[in-house]
């Protein structure tokens, strides 16, 4: 309920949002036992404003020099700047904060320099070479300053006069900087245009990693055979392209924040006598000796073209293994820290991808193009440090503990929950006692019940052209993925005054009645609610992601001097149709936004349905 959408989900429609004086009512006051999750959504919508204005700067410059034939020297410089200001304000009528104004100004500057030398040459029109070497330097600087205050005399100035706050909070500032340096080289070789070989190597140095582990070394190579260029393929006129390829390469990830390997201090104030004295204390994140997260990948594929490229097929098989995987790990409170980032082990991904494209019909007045893709990926945790399981993010909304786990031999972030056995003779929820000790223990009575990763994903893109009309649609699908519907647990929180759906009343267990079809426990204060497979649902879906219709005006008939190149009138819609068995609002969810905690739906804001119309003019 901390977000506006969460408040709308959680507040019962039976609650009146205003008191007898016409002021916003704190919905938690209806019952003394009401959950902290319940907030007045109208108050949050009308009496709070949150605005971010971002100015972006993008500058690129390059210099090319060709001293001799085939030799190219290129140096380039790029600057990307982001200047953002966030303003948040809650009015004097807002009942959940004391009339608060927040201002946060963030500035990020990213510069990159690339110096690249390439040399192309051939021998006897048989052997062709392309040699490249270079150096890149990237630097990012981030600065922010935040200030806030509350208890203002008037709402007129909102965040534009923090000095008028009755209570001014201590301002805060933040600074970070990271640097990435790279040396790279590549050789491309072609024999008769049919046999292709590529070899490359790069060395990356990142300031984010520990002192002795800042440099990572990443080789790669690939070979390919253009079978369609062979003389014996001339008799197969329908085959316009056939290319076989295989490759191997390593890449590195810098997906950690700066200074994660250093023992940082945080600041605060404590009361000493009549004064607040500033102090320093260790950060809540324990620093580790971190090294590069590295992914090694094998790839084999084939590219096919038929009927002068009107039909194109691309198929790939890949195997990826990521070692020294970086992940946040919770620490026991006795350590004095809450968490740490650690190289926890290795995971693998292997799968196949298929892409089929076709220009089915192409003539003056009518055209039909189709594109279909399907992909299967299998994810597996190969190894963990000391072989120990790692639990995912802890939720405390309705149950207790975490919902996901990282375990050797299982998918990353698999659902790790209790096994629901239905309702007992008293109408209460019951669970399977896995180890038979008569108690429910987090570590011994839970099991892996599902995975948020799909068996396969697929998509269909269709484009139809008739004279000056264009019609396009894109279908997107996911099959076999599970969703943990944490929002559904709200329907079991009987004793907290939460918004509970009408079906609970009709489908709940009742004393003295036939309860063979009861789906919900007896309506009372439920004390045995746990994260169980009861809340795991099939998250498969097929979605009409985009559909559009456009008309191109025949400008060539009345723009005689070619000053007008085109006028296009269009209407398009996004996410207007979704077919799914998932009972929640949207099956395409991830409350925490990471692979370790993917597929958890907790009052998640759904994908927006949009309808847009416009005119595009080209001169």
Identify the residue ranges that each predicted region occupies.
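C-terminal structured "cap/appendage" subdomains that terminate the fold
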Residues: 546-579
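Transmembrane beta-barrel architecture of outer membranes
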Residues: 182, 216-218
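Surface-exposed loop/interface segments of Gram-negative outer-membrane beta-barrel transport/assembly proteins
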Residues: 1-56, 74-181, 229-297, 308, ...
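Solvent-exposed loop/turn segments connecting transmembrane beta-strands
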Residues: 207-212
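Glycine-rich, aromatic-lined ligand/substrate-binding cores of catalytic
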Residues: 451-484
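Residues on the lipid-exposed face of transmembrane beta-strands in outer-membrane beta-barrel proteins
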Residues: 61-65, 115-119, 133, 185-189, ...
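Short beta-strand segments enriched in hydrophobic/aromatic residues
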Residues: 65-67, 79, 121, 137, ...
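Transmembrane beta-strand segments that form the barrel wall of outer-membrane beta-barrel proteins
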Residues: 197-206
């Amino acid at each position: 309920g901390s977000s506006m959408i969460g408040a709308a989900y959680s507040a019962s429609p039976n609650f009146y949002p205003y008191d007898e004086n016409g002021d916003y009512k704190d919905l938690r006051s209806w019952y003394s036992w009401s959950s902290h999750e319940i907030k007045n959504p109208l108050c949050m919508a009308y009496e709070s404003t949150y605005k971010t204005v971002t100015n972006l700067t993008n500058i690129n410059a390059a210099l090319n020099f060709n001293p001799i034939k085939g030799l190219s020297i290129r140096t380039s410089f790029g600057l990307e700047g982001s200047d953002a200001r966030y303003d948040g304000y809650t009015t004097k009528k807002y009942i959940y904060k004391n009339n608060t104004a927040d201002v946060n100004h963030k500035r990020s500057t990213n510069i990159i320099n690339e110096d690249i030398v390439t040399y192309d040459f051939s021998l006897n029109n048989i052997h062709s070479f392309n040699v490249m070497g270079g150096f890149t330097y990237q630097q990012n600087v981030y600065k922010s300053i935040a200030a806030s205050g509350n208890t203002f005399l008037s709402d007129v100035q909102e965040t534009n006069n923090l000095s008028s706050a009755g209570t001014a909070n201590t301002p805060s500032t933040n600074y970070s900087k990271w640097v990435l340096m790279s040396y790279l080289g590549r050789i491309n070789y072609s024999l008769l245009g049919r046999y292709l070989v590529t070899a490359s190597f790069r060395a990356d140095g990142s300031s984010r990693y520990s002192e002795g582990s800042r440099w990572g070394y990443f080789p790669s190579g690939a070979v390919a055979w253009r079978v369609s260029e062979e003389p014996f393929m001339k008799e197969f006129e329908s085959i316009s392209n056939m290319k076989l390829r295989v490759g191997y390469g390593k890449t590195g990830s810098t997906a950690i924040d700066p200074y994660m390997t250093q023992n940082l201090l945080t600041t605060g104030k404590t009361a000493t006598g009549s004064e607040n004295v500033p102090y320093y204390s260790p950060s809540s994140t324990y620093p580790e000796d971190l090294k590069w997260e590295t992914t090694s990948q094998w790839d084999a594929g084939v590219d096919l073209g038929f009927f002068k490229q009107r039909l194109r097929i691309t198929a790939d098989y890949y195997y990826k293994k990521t070692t020294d995987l970086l992940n946040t790990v919770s620490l026991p409170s006795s350590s004095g820290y809450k968490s740490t980032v650690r190289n926890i082990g290795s995971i693998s991904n292997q799968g196949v991808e298929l892409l089929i494209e076709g220009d089915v019909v192409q003539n003056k007045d009518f055209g039909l193009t189709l594109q279909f893709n399907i992909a299967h990926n299998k994810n597996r945790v190969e190894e963990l440090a000391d072989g120990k399981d790692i639990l995912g993010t802890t939720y405390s909304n309705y149950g207790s503990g975490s919902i996901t786990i990282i375990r050797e031999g299982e998918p990353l972030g698999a659902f790790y929950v209790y096994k629901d056995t239905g309702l007992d003779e008293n109408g209460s929820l019951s669970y399977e006692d896995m180890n038979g000790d008569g108690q429910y223990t987090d570590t011994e009575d839970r099991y892996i019940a599902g995975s948020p990763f799909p068996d396969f994903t697929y998509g269909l893109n269709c484009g139809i052209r008739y004279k000056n009309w264009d019609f396009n649609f894109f279908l997107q699908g996911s099959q076999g993925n599970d969703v943990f519907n944490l929002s559904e647990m709200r329907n079991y929180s009987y004793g907290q005054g939460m918004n509970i759906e009408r079906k609970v009343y009709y489908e709940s267990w009742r004393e003295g009645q036939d309860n063979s079809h009861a789906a919900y426990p007896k309506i009372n204060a439920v004390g045995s609610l746990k994260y169980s497979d009861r809340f795991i649902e099939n998250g498969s879906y097929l979605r009409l992601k985009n559909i559009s219709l456009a008309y191109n005006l025949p400008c060539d008939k009345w723009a005689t001097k070619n000053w007008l190149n085109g006028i296009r009138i269009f209407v398009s819609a996004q996410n207007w149709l979704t077919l799914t068995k998932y009972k929640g609002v949207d099956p395409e969810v991830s409350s925490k936004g990471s692979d370790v905690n993917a597929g958890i739906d907790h009052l998640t804001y759904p994908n927006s349905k949009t309808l847009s119309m416009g005119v595009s003019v080209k001169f």
